[in-house]
């Protein structure tokens, strides 16, 4: 039997589809999400409704975003979920979550078993809507969760770590083996909770500057910042901020990156390119 077929649906590689089918894992995720009636719950990539059904059972209304037209059609005719669902057959990568929160009159609670081939760019898309999001629970490749939660001085620490922790409190929830899916992915998975900061611990004047600095630093992560960011900061400026120019990108904390971004923004030293 083709192990890419689950409940009569052929998993599509181009959509990165792996369907969750382990009841213990499903129950654990739903318990972590803890959906409540009256909340603006939004699922990205409901697939064959492994999470949609148990979450939907607890709710009067549930919004889902599903790119695959066949799966969206199945949900429309679902025996008990159908009437509760608002289905957007759209790409989550271009979806306007701010408009949806405005329409629903409250911040969104977003969850999903995300396609691993788009998980990182989708995270960055969602970060731009954190003022419209109450919290997020996602199943991701374990390596991506490790990067989201990583601190300085570790190999996993990178641009994703800095930007995620700038916007959110990031909490690992549970690890999930490949056997919990059909077809089984070639990697381990994990569930993570991201809660946007109510008050930014390290506010920056222009987040585009922070994004630019972290991109340049981590694109040359083996170099010291004296070299990788030498076009933006002199040794004297770095030292004046209490940042050792001999450090590499992975040694610099989120707070220090924010400090550097604010220096550039305050002094109008970064030209858009």
From Swiss-Prot:
SUPFAM superfamilies, A to Z: S-adenosyl-L-methionine-dependent methyltransferases
Keywords assigned by UniProt, alphabetized: Cytoplasm, Methyltransferase, RNA-binding, rRNA processing, S-adenosyl-L-methionine, Transferase
PROSITE patterns documented for this protein: RRNA_A_DIMETH, SAM_RNA_A_N6_MT
Record EC number: 2.1.1.182
GO CC annotation, single: cytosol
Reactions mediated catalytically: adenosine(1518)/adenosine(1519) in 16S rRNA + 4 S-adenosyl-L-methionine = N(6)-dimethyladenosine(1518)/N(6)-dimethyladenosine(1519) in 16S rRNA + 4 S-adenosyl-L-homocysteine + 4 H(+)
Subcellular location per the Swiss-Prot or TrEMBL entry: Cytoplasm
Location (main, coarse): cytoplasm
Domain of life: Bacteria
InterPro entries in alphabetical order: KsgA/Erm (IPR001737), rRNA_Ade_diMease-like_C (IPR023165), rRNA_Ade_Mease_Trfase_CS (IPR020596), rRNA_Ade_methylase_Trfase_N (IPR020598), rRNA_adenine_dimethylase (IPR011530), SAM-dependent_MTases_sf (IPR029063)
GO molecular function: 16S rRNA (adenine(1518)-N(6)/adenine(1519)-N(6))-dimethyltransferase activity; RNA binding
Binding-site list for S-adenosyl-L-methionine: 18, 20, 45, 66, 91, 113
One Pfam assignment: RrnaAD
Keyword RNA-binding: yes
Role summary: Specifically dimethylates two adjacent adenosines (A1518 and A1519) in the loop of a conserved hairpin near the 3'-end of 16S rRNA in the 30S particle. May play a critical role in biogenesis of 30S subunits.
PANTHER family from the UniProt entry: DIMETHYLADENOSINE TRANSFERASE (PTHR11727), DIMETHYLADENOSINE TRANSFERASE-RELATED (PTHR11727:SF7)
Family: Belongs to the class I-like SAM-binding methyltransferase superfamily. rRNA adenine N(6)-methyltransferase family. RsmA subfamily.
Name this protein carries in UniProt: Ribosomal RNA small subunit methyltransferase A
Biological classification of the source: Bacteria, Pseudomonadati, Pseudomonadota, Gammaproteobacteria, Enterobacterales
The encoding gene: rsmA
